[in-house]
């Protein structure tokens, strides 16, 4: 996405993601198919229930195995984030199957990269670009940044200034190659340690499974909210991460049109 277009899109998302449950109903919406999802361990979000949102999506990796994407589409899924790469030497073995079949089912999709702080930003950007063709990027690519304490090879936690510098280099490389400004995915602790008040001109996809993001992420406007890791989605075997877009269907169509250029 061109830098000149970003302020327009961000102003729209700042409006919709800052809405209360009362003002959300005032947004202009169109009729959409009601999602047919369940959750094996649902969280009570009160009036901020994610099901109040119009646009729902999932994220997948090799751990989800084979997916019936036609059934996923019929269940009410509008978008999918698909794991592509990790570090500077790993590709998700299901990536190509997932994005090609999601595309065939007319589901908008974006690849994501799981960042390791044990190799350089350039090495990881090179690896992502080498393995992710431009046709696999219908929505902006995603940089997934979170601490990884269970990793057998990389538990490194650089200082915040180092983290942000590496992120910026990686983001710049991807934006230059794909022509779309990447989305940033993050977790509560990583955001607290490194990202509060930073990267305000990027769209954020946030993990918040215990409370609404406005209660967890300090001063952060979000575009996507991952609200559960225990979802049940027709067409996907086993627990599934489910997400919502912050605005209405009209906002979604506008965002996709702009972000996909």
For the regions a protein language model found, what residue spans apply to each?
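Bacterial N-terminal signal peptides that target proteins for export
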Residues: 1-9
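Functionally critical loop-and-helix segments that line ligand-binding/catalytic clefts
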Residues: 24-57, 199-261
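Extracellular/periplasmic catalytic domains that process cell-envelope and extracellular macromolecules
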Residues: 49-52, 73-76, 104, 134-137, ...
């Amino acid at each position: 996405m061109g830098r000149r277009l970003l302020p327009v899109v961000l102003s729209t998302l700042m409006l919709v993601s800052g809405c209360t449950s009362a003002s959300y109903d005032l947004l202009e919406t169109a009729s959409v198919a009601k999602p047919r999802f369940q959750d094996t361990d649902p969280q009570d979000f009160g009036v901020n229930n994610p099901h109040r949102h119009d646009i729902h999506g999932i994220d997948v990796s090799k751990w989800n195995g084979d997916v019936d994407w036609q059934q996923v589409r019929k269940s009410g899924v509008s978008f999918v984030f698909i794991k592509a790469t990790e570090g500077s030497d790993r590709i998700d073995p299901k990536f190509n199957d997932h994005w090609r079949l999601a595309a065939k089912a007319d589901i908008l999709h974006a690849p994501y990269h799981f960042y390791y702080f044990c190799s350089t930003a350039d090495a990881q950007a090179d690896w992502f670009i080498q393995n992710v063709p431009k046709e696999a990027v219908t929505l902006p690519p995603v940089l997934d940044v979170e601490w990884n304490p269970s990793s057998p090879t990389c538990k490194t936690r650089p200082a915040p200034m180092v983290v942000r510098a590496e992120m910026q280099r990686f983001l710049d490389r991807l934006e230059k190659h794909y022509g779309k400004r990447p989305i940033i995915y993050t977790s509560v602790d990583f955001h607290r340690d490194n990202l509060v008040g930073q990267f305000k001109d990027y769209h954020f996809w946030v993990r918040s499974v215990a409370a609404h993001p406005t209660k967890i992420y300090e001063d952060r406007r979000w575009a996507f909210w991952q609200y559960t890791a225990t979802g049940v989605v027709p067409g996907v075997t086993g627990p599934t991460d489910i997400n919502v877009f912050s605005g209405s269907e009209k906002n979604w169509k506008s965002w996709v049109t702009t972000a996909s250029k």
